[in-house]
Amino acid sequence: MNKLIRMVPGVLAVVAGVPALAGEKIQLIEHADTDATLDLGAKGDSVGDLLTFANPVYDAANKTQVGSDQGYCVRVIAGKSWECFWTLRLKDGQITIEGPFYDAGDSVMAVTGGTGKYAGAKGSMKLHSRDAKGSSYDLTYELL
């Protein structure tokens, strides 16, 4: 029993060490097909409005659908930014995201966790609009 107790901390150190995904970069393209804005604040674009979505996600070549994402954003600064929470669903697991989404320019959000292959994931995700309409986005996940 004493040997088992001494072994467990070593095993925990290996399990809690650097994940196998460290340094992995995932490049995807989201098609913003279902984005819907709910006008919950003052009439028009205002603090408190809600943006919801459940969109297909494609490989970096924009040819094959490899998953989907779904989530919501709350308007925090009218005409400027949202605070978002969403889940990317891929074949081998999920990655959760949280952070600001800016109306203009790129956004960088935190990877806050995951499931399956991505269990314990952390890092960042850069979001870049591919066009002025916001109909598709480059998503670059950098896992630590």
What kind of feature is each model-predicted range?
Residues 17-18:
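N-terminal signal peptide c-region/cleavage motif recognized by signal peptidases
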Residues 4, 21-144:
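Targeting-peptide/extracellular-domain and disordered-appendage signature
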Residues 1-8:
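Bacterial N-terminal signal peptides that target proteins for export
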Residues 11-13:
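Intrinsically disordered, low-complexity, mixed-charge
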